[in-house]
A protein has these predicted regions:
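P-loop NTPase catalytic core of nucleic-acid-dependent motor ATPases
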Residues: 1-143, 148
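Alpha-helix capping/termination and helix-coil
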Residues: 95, 123-130, 151, 162, ...
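Hydrophobic positions in the central parallel beta-sheet of the AAA+
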Residues: 153-155
């Protein structure tokens, strides 16, 4: 069986703890055992987010040539979209919940520009909740119920009406918000980083007023991904033409202290 550094599926195996004081890692065969292991890892994610990421990707190790190439590919991607490398520092402070009242990170652009690639790489190591248009329209009262006990929130093409706007503002500002639970009581959603991927500049339906849109905008950092991603052209001078999850975190780590 292949060696893994994180547990996503039943049967994944750990050879040793990455951080013995925080982890206990086992062969995982039954769902009950899997649940027990995940609880330990999720607790680690939320109590020591920085050390969790450092351990997971080996960010405090000396960089290899492969690591440096992965960083350069992400730098090429951001340069291609005229996004400064200070985005690395923005993403680091955001995921560590150190971004103050701007707790939302939004990537806006047309299909095929690489928004999904960035978002998938960012949420890859986290226990995340996904909120999309269908959920928001069908169950507005329960829009945030899947966010309970998670480490990050991903919103894909979010579209919501006035009835949940105030709770959305709280979530994007880094405040605790409330959600209804099916067959349960109203529950508090803890402060979590919110990642947004959308083809639309504004979020929300016609019931939202100008002041609502302005308040939502003030609670997010927005980046426009404006150029189509064609890896075979953009990365033709590199050994590989794929943007990797680890590469993005290596890029973030390299630029985590950069500020505008």
């Amino acid at each position: 069986m292949a060696i893994k550094h994180h547990c996503y599926n039943e049967g994944d195996v750990f050879t040793k703890p990455l951080h013995p004081e925080k982890y206990k890692l086992y062969y995982v065969w039954r769902s009950s055992q899997k649940h027990e292991v995940w609880l330990q890892i999720f607790k680690y994610q939320n109590t020591d987010r920085e050390q969790y990421i450092i351990d997971l990707f080996g960010l405090d190790n000396e960089r290899t040539e492969e690591d440096l190439e992965e960083i350069r590919k992400w730098e090429t991607f951001f340069k291609h979209n005229k996004i400064p490398f200070t985005i690395g520092g923005v993403m680091w402070r955001w995921m560590m919940i150190q971004a103050g009242r701007k707790n939302g990170l939004k990537f806006y652009g047309q299909p095929g520009t690489g928004k999904t690639t960035i978002c998938n790489a960012l949420v890859y190591p986290w226990h995340n909740a996904v909120i999309n248009t269908v959920q928001a329209v069908k169950n507005p009262s329960f829009m945030f119920q899947d966010c309970i006990g998670k480490s990050m929130i991903l919103m894909e093409e979010p579209w919501f009406e006035k009835e949940v706007c105030e709770e959305m503002k709280k979530l994007l500002a880094g405040d605790h918000c409330h959600t209804d639970i099916k067959q349960g009581h109203q529950t508090t959603v803890a402060k979590l980083p919110v990642l947004i991927s959308t083809n639309f500049f504004q979020m929300g339906g016609p019931s939202l007023e100008y002041a609502d849109h302005a308040a939502l905008k003030d609670r997010m950092v927005t980046y426009t991904i404006g150029k189509r991603l064609i890896p075979s052209v953009l990365f033709k001078d590199f050994k590989t033409q794929t943007l990797t999850n680890k590469g993005l975190y290596q890029f973030i780590w390299a630029h985590k202290d950069d500020k505008n």
